[in-house]
Amino acid sequence: MALQNEKNSRYLLRDWKPENPAFWENKGKHIARRNLWISVSCLLLAFCVWMLFSAVTVNLNKIGFNFTTDQLFLLTALPSVSGALLRVPYSFMVPIFGGRRWTVFSTAILIIPCVWLGIAVQNPNTPFGIFIVIALLCGFAGANFASSMGNISFFFPKAKQGSALGINGGLGNLGVSVMQLVAPLVIFVPVFAFLGVNGVPQADGSVMSLANAAWIWVPLLAIATIAAWSGMNDIASSRASIADQLPVLQRLHLWLLSLLYLATFGSFIGFSAGFAMLAKTQFPDVNILRLAFFGPFIGAIARSVGGAISDKFGGVRVTLINFIFMAIFSALLFLTLPGTGSGNFIAFYAVFMGLFLTAGLGSGSTFQMIAVIFRQITIYRVKMKGGSDEQAHKEAVTETAAALGFISAIGAVGGFFIPQAFGMSLNMTGSPVGAMKVFLIFYIVCVLLTWLVYGRRKFSQK
């Protein structure tokens, strides 16, 4: 049901003016913060579901399955494929259905892949094709990011959007590390024994109940759905059809900024999905699941910081410096990998933590760039055509939200390509070096792109 059918709802905000200082201080900021924190909770759980397979795949063969390394890397990558594709339509949904309604729907449906995965892992005869379908369904969780970020952008004034988007995206991204921290612990606890879940004995005498890794999120998703229904709002002025939002695809800056976001958020989500499997192949004697959560945790916290410092120092400056460090860490990684020797796990882990840190910081700074740049170019374009300030502001809000959602879809593609690149490189050469060379070159290209287009001079308002 579209927003126009919600005219009499107490959840519909008919007069929303966050740029008005008096309105913001007296009323707006309290409503915006409530919507932000509920959004953070829903998005955090969505990221938990999106990255489920990054923790599940490393344990599948321990409970009776016999999948190849390529198959396991594929399962970790597939949620990012569907998540990236679904982010495109998801980015247009909030102005059509409303942020509250869409958050309720998009959170509730995540219960389906969680329940199904918990059932599937209990039968070692479950076909690989079933896991492919479940992995693709987990991608719906990744799509939530596009609608969530677009929705929150409507609630905050431009001066606070970097911080607000950083908090929403950063703490939402924290779901990756929460899942990778909780899953390895909960699978050894008989949480759902009352449902007849029988664990599989392990060589060390423990009993693994892998279904717990999926089912533990079901009650939390139900609670978050109820919270979104009862505590969030829809904004009447944010209403726009798909036709109103599609012109954003014609903007050159949409595609340039998509590349930058692919390098930052794409790296964060790709490394989150593939790091545990990569570390397991390079350092098989290390129990990586006890350490894997820390990288996504650093990246998620860094995203919030990246948005905040970009509001203060400028997103372009922060992004440029960040890409330089991403390139440096990528180059250092070559020195830590096993070659003729056994490699150095401590150095490998430390350098990867640096990559997670910079990927997180860059995710926050590039999103701040997107919000600022699209607001500027839209206002400039509307006024050049003789439009009023009110019209310019309205179109700027709509185009910025659409751009944030669409660019987030491009960024999510990294969650597929990075694990697949690692898997392909390992399959062809027995080493991930080939994949890392590609990443290093890409980061260098992004340094040049950021500097030449946005850093040296005032960019073209097109």
From Swiss-Prot:
Gene3D superfamilies: MFS general substrate transporter like domains (1.20.1250.20). The chain crosses the membrane at residues 36-56, 77-97, 102-122, 126-146, 181-201, 207-227, 259-279, 288-308, 318-338, 345-365, 402-422, 433-453. Changing residue 145 to E/W: Loss of activity. One of its GO terms (molecular function) is nitrate transmembrane transporter activity. GO terms for cellular component: plasma membrane. It is found in: Cell inner membrane. Residues 57-76, 123-125, 202-206, 280-287, 339-344, 423-432 are periplasmic. CDD domains: MFS_NRT2_like (cd17341). The keyword Metal-binding does not apply. Its main location: membrane. Induction: Expressed preferentially during the stationary phase in the absence of nitrate. Changing residue 307 to L: Loss of activity. Changing residue 311 to G/K: Loss of activity. Changing residue 266 to A/P/T: Loss of activity. Changing residue 99 to T: Decrease in activity. Keywords: Cell inner membrane, Cell membrane, Membrane, Nitrate assimilation, Transmembrane, Transmembrane helix, Transport. It is a multi-pass membrane protein. SUPFAM superfamilies: MFS general substrate transporter. Residues 1-35, 98-101, 147-180, 228-258, 309-317, 366-401, 454-462 are cytoplasmic. GO terms for biological process: nitrate assimilation; nitrate transmembrane transport; nitrite transport. Changing residue 172 to V: Loss of activity. Belongs to the major facilitator superfamily. Nitrate/nitrite porter (TC 2.A.1.8) family. Catalyzes nitrate uptake, nitrite uptake and nitrite export across the cytoplasmic membrane. May function as a nitrate/H(+) and nitrite/H(+) channel. Could confer a selective advantage during severe nutrient starvation or slow growth. This is Nitrate/nitrite transporter NarU. It comes from Escherichia coli (strain K12).
